[in-house]
Regions:
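Extracytosolic ligand-binding ectodomains
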Residues: 2-9, 14, 24-442
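C-terminal motif of bacterial Sec signal peptides marking the signal peptidase cleavage site
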Residues: 19-22
Length: 442
């Protein structure tokens, strides 16, 4: 599906960003994309990983309702082979958001246990960061396992790209997809490009303990999943579930971990408005899992991280991006293969600036993900040269009956660009923007 793509690296800072801003239109003219033929201002609308998926388009029946809407999501240029193998797991996949990150979360967990010679999370947690840099490069479990069994050090470059974990157990740099909706309200894969944000030099330097001697254990590695099968992030569930299942399939095809097949116990995270995640975590812990992959939602993870890590179980999320996890007191048992919002905010702000927008409105979900990404985006826009009064950031309650007041504030502000940072409720917000002539609808 990701065909006709291009790749580039984010290195636009300081004066370069100021130069791009200076090339944009005036406040009256809007951005360079805006209504050039009619002379009318076309507001540019942007999304992020919480809504930039084909599931968003399913809420719109009118052609062109999302046409031209752009956005960012952690994404690498996945190989056709990897995507085809995911489709063998789930032939109905619509997109691949966080499939690579989920696959890598499972592989890293298995490699850490293999390296430690133990399925005890408090033992193998010390190996996780060191598996992502500094050693011999490998790209799948089988080849990495061969290196470990020979006493070597591993640098796992996975499906989501080189991970290069920093000390908090998160990527120091990451690939982001720049996505755009077409007239049919689906993502136009021909317009997808990729950028790199962050710096691999910020990766940790401690490669951790030496691998334990190769051997077997009587206890199989048991991995639970806490992924969104229901709730406002359910559209992310299928690719994440497929990524986890494919990883376990590959691990067991290579002989499993410490001579035993890995066991996978699946579970639903729901969303932050329910206690589904708490119930699932209780069930997984009672089942004796050694690690839990999930949740996707930062808000959901914050409700269960203490229960998981205080039980001596590792949590590794493929999609948490809130900055709160970088400094969270997690007994060194929390990791993530998704990059923190500081990196996505940089990619998003660069995209907005490169499109020539001089004024920016932000509508952000009032939760750790939404407020964190909004704050970081505002800072990056200001670092790029926009003044504080050229940016208006509003938070909203996703459970609200309507978003009329928030939309009206955007109408009154009349910015060149509007960023919607949300989940499934984003469609209702965008519908309101369209009805008021400031949405993506062409």
């Amino acid at each position: 599906m990701r065909t006709g793509t291009t790749a580039r690296s984010i290195a636009v800072t300081g004066a370069a960003l100021l130069a791009i801003t200076a090339c944009g239109g005036s406040d009256d003219e809007g951005s360079t994309d805006a209504g050039a033929d009619s002379g009318e201002k076309q507001v540019n609308v942007y999304g992020t990983d919480g809504n930039m998926g084909n599931a968003l388009g399913e809420d719109f029946s009118e052609e062109g309702a999302l046409a031209g809407m752009k956005g960012t999501t952690p994404l690498t240029d996945l190989s056709d082979d990897f995507k085809n193998r995911l489709l063998e797991i789930d032939p109905d996949l619509q997109d691949y958001n966080y499939a690579g990150e989920t696959y890598d979360a499972v592989i890293l967990t298995a490699l850490a246990a293999q390296a430690a010679g133990s399925t005890e999370a408090n033992v193998f947690k010390e190996y996780v960061n060191g598996l992502t840099f500094g050693g011999d490069t490998c790209t799948d479990f089988a080849s990495c396992k061969e290196i470990l069994d020979a006493g070597g050090n591993v640098d796992y470059d996975g499906a989501s790209g080189p991970l290069s974990f920093a000390d908090p157990g998160e990527p120091a740099e990451a690939s982001f997809g720049l996505l755009q909706f077409g007239d049919d309200n689906t993502l136009d894969d021909e317009l997808t490009s990729f950028v790199i944000a962050g710096d691999e030099d910020n990766a940790a330097t401690d490669e951790g303990p030496a691998p334990a001697p190769a051997g077997a254990t009587g206890d199989p590695l048991v991995i639970g999943t806490l992924l969104p099968l229901t709730g406002n992030l359910a559209f992310l569930g299928p690719p994440e579930v497929a990524g986890a299942a494919l990883a376990v399939q590959d691990i067991n095809a290579a002989g499993g971990v410490l001579g035993q097949p890995v066991q996978l116990i699946e579970g639903d995270s729901g969303d932050a408005s329910t206690d589904t995640a708490t119930q699932t975590v209780d069930r997984l812990l009672q089942s004796g899992v050694d690690a839990i992959v999930g949740a996707a939602s930062s808000g959901v993870s914050l409700t269960v991280i203490d229960a998981i890590t205080q039980a001596g179980v590792m949590q590794i999320s493929p999609a948490n991006t809130s900055d709160q996890f970088t400094t969270y007191n997690d007994n060194n048992l929390y990791f993530r293969t998704a990059p923190p919002d500081t990196l996505q905010a940089r990619a998003l702000a660069d995209l907005i600036i490169e499109d020539g927008n001089n004024t920016v409105g932000i509508l952000a979900l009032n939760d750790p993900y939404g407020t964190g990404l909004a704050e970081n985006t505002v800072q990056n826009l200001m670092d790029a040269g926009l003044s504080e009064d050229a940016i208006q950031s509003i938070t909203y309650d996703p459970q609200a009956a309507n978003f009329d007041s928030e939309v009206q504030e955007m109408v009154d502000f009349n910015p060149d660009a509007i960023v919607v940072i949300g989940f499934e409720e984003s469609s209702r917000i965008i519908e309101g923007l369209n009805q008021n002539g400031i949405g993506p609808q062409r």
